Structure formats: C-alpha cells, structure tokens
C-alpha cells in the first residue's frame, strides 16, 4: 500500500479513484493531480513507481489542503462563527440545521432522537 498524506491508499484501484480516499480530495482534484503529474487514467496504484508516488505526494503537499489541516480549518471556521454570535453560529451552537431547513417536523439527524414530552398524547 502506498502512503500519501498519512493515508494508506488501496493498491488495486486506479490512481484517481484511490486518491479519493484522502479527506479533501474528490473526483475533480484527483483528476487534476493525475493530469498534473502526467499519469495515465487507467494506471493502478500498484503499477506506480516510487518516483511517481513521490511526485503525487509533492503535488498534494504543494497545492491542496488535506486531512488534519483541512479538518482543523473547518472546525476553526465553525468555532469562529460561534464566537461571533451570528445566526449561523447560534444554529451550530444549538445543534440545529444551519442552512434554512425546516425544523418543525424534520431535522432528526441534526437534533438527535425525539425526546418524550410528559402528558403529550393524542
């Protein structure tokens, strides 16, 4: 298994598919990286030389924010919104949907399991 950005990449998959196992790299960035390094689309990770793996690793380190750094930045952005006290920050703090979804009947994923209310029967 090749190790790129602290993640073990599966060896039997195509390179652009295997790169998507790294947090922060999706289909678009994976294609960009593969074309920038100059690797054919149908090559598999186990067919790559150590030099090509090193080129991929350097391209990712130079141009993309992935794994821990990306997670840290996202959590810092959410924390900043919460510290500002803006509407989006309040919604994050209260564990409610942030982007305007309805909460009267839905949003169970964000709010958690339904809490029973004493004396409330139909």
UniProtKB/Swiss-Prot annotation:
GO biological process, one term: translation
Entry keyword set: Ribonucleoprotein, Ribosomal protein, RNA-binding, rRNA-binding, tRNA-binding
GO molecular function per UniProt: rRNA binding; structural constituent of ribosome; tRNA binding
Pfam families with a match to the protein in the record: Ribosomal_S13
Ranges where the record places region Disordered: 97-122
Keyword Lyase carried by entry: no
Taxonomic superkingdom: Bacteria
Transmembrane segments: none
Subunit description: Part of the 30S ribosomal subunit. Forms a loose heterodimer with protein S19. Forms two bridges to the 50S subunit in the 70S ribosome.
Described purpose of this protein according to its UniProt entry: Located at the top of the head of the 30S subunit, it contacts several helices of the 16S rRNA. In the 70S ribosome it contacts the 23S rRNA (bridge B1a) and protein L5 of the 50S subunit (bridge B1b), connecting the 2 subunits; these bridges are implicated in subunit movement. Contacts the tRNAs in the A and P-sites.
Protein name (Swiss-Prot/TrEMBL): Small ribosomal subunit protein uS13
Organism: Brucella canis (strain ATCC 23365 / NCTC 10854 / RM-666)
């Amino acid at each position: 298994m090749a190790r790129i950005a602290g993640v073990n990449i599966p060896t039997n998959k195509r390179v652009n598919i295997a790169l998507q196992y790294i947090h922060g790299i999706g289909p678009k960035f994976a294609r960009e990286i593969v074309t920038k390094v100059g690797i054919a689309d149908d090559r598999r990770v186990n067919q790559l030389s150590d030099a090509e793996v090193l080129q991929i690793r350097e391209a990712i380190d130079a141009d993309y924010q992935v794994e821990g750094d990306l997670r840290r930045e996202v959590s810092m952005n959410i924390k900043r919104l919460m510290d500002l006290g803006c509407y989006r920050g309040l919604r994050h703090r209260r564990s409610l949907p942030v982007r305007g979804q309805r909460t009267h009947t839905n949003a169970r994923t964000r709010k958690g399991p339904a809490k029973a209310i004493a004396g409330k029967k139909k």
